């Protein structure tokens, strides 16, 4: 799947993901009826099987790259030891990141109740609206940025433009979700009612992670994978301390606030360390001004019900974003209009 991403074969990537889900559903449903007392084992086996099918299909679709017979291209004969040394810190940081993402739920289990965990989980479900933007962007950005660095190592406008565009998109979606959070909750059903006050700070999770994908490029280009461990430990420590203090005081809202702040720290650490090895002027001053404004907006909507101030706060944040990112917003509008015009012509 990684090679598919590197080749920008988005249709093949989507087809493999869909095939993976279809195989999983087709196989798992009958097996669950047959082995009624072994549901966990069935799920593990079927998940492994569907991934193997996806892997085989991907290799077959790219048979020109995967050469198992005859002489292989000397350019593809890589020394695995440097690759292993580069990859190991990512494995460690992934383990720490898993703990980082679970701390809020663990804290709610320890300091709160199962009902609070349920409400918090429902809020996280609504946040999945970001998944479409986040996954689509992350799918293509890293291969594109690495390719651009390989071809034009001194051209940094590409990273600045990518950062500005995804900043505008993610903050716009996040602020809009905060404004209409009560409507989303009502539409989704009674079990989501308690999620309305938790949502505002949870938006910083996908916002900061996705934007940081554009600012962390320096660590990737310079192969400073060990710094990923430092970043993961720093963000995780902040989240542990934050949840330990705020969850006993505020419950679910405290967990959301702590998680949101820790993701801002996560973004900052990624950006600072990346700029240490490969400096890019991301105009962080205006970014943090916008972030502070959205923090204030999220705070109000966490502790107060929807009213005229919620709408006014949204308008202020949108105007502020337009003032600081006007060129990017205008470019985005022109780009969308060009897509619409091209579709009409077809």
Residue spans of the language-model regions?
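Helix-loop junctions and terminal segments of transmembrane helices
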Residues: 123-163, 216-221
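Membrane-interface junctions at transmembrane-helix termini in multi-pass inner-membrane proteins
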Residues: 1-17, 203-234, 274-276
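Membrane-proximal transmembrane or re-entrant/amphipathic helices at the cytosolic face
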Residues: 301-346
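Interhelical loop/hinge segments that connect adjacent transmembrane helices in multipass membrane
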Residues: 39-45, 57-101, 144-157, 278-289, ...
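Interfacial transmembrane-helix starts/ends
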Residues: 84, 121, 153-168, 172-180, ...
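Alpha-helical transmembrane segments of polytopic membrane transporters and translocases
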Residues: 89, 104-108, 116-134, 164-168, ...
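Hydrophobic alpha-helical transmembrane segments
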Residues: 15-66, 233-238, 252-273, 314-317
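Interfacial segments at transmembrane-helix termini and the short loops linking adjacent helices
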Residues: 114, 178-207
């Amino acid at each position: 799947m990684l090679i598919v991403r590197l080749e920008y074969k988005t249709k093949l990537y989507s087809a493999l993901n869909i095939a993976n889900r279809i195989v999983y559903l087709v196989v798992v449903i009958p097996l669950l009826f047959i082995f009624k007392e072994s549901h966990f084992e069935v799920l593990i086996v079927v998940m492994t099987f569907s991934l193997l099918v996806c892997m085989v299909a991907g290799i077959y679709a790219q048979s020109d790259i995967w050469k198992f017979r005859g002489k292989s291209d000397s350019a593809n004969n890589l020394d695995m030891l440097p690759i292993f040394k580069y990859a190991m810190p990512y494995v460690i940081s992934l383990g720490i990141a898993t703990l980082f993402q679970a701390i809020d739920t663990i804290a709610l289990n320890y300091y709160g109740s199962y009902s609070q965990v349920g409400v918090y989980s429902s809020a996280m479900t609504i946040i999945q609206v970001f998944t479409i933007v986040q996954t689509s962007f992350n799918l293509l950005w890293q291969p594109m940025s690495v390719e651009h660095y390989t071809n034009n190592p001194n051209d940094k406008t590409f990273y600045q433009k990518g950062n500005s565009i995804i900043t505008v998109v993610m903050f716009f979606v996040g602020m809009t979700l905060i404004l209409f959070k009560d409507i989303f909750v009502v539409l989704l059903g009674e079990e989501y009612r308690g999620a309305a006050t938790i949502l505002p700070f949870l938006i910083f999770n996908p916002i900061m992670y996705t934007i940081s994908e554009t600012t962390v490029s320096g660590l990737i280009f310079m192969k400073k994978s060990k710094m990923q461990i430092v970043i993961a430990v720093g963000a995780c420590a902040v989240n542990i301390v934050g949840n330990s203090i705020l969850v006993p005081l505020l419950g679910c809202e405290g967990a959301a606030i702590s998680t949101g702040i820790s993701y801002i720290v996560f973004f900052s650490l990624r950006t600072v360390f990346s700029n240490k090895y490969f400096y890019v002027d991301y105009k962080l001053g205006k970014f943090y001004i916008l972030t502070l404004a959205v923090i204030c907006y999220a705070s109000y909507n966490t502790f107060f019900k929807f009213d005229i101030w919620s709408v006014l706060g949204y308008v202020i944040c949108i105007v502020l974003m337009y003032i600081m990112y006007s060129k990017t917003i205008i470019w985005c509008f022109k780009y969308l209009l060009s897509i619409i015009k091209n579709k009409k012509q077809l």
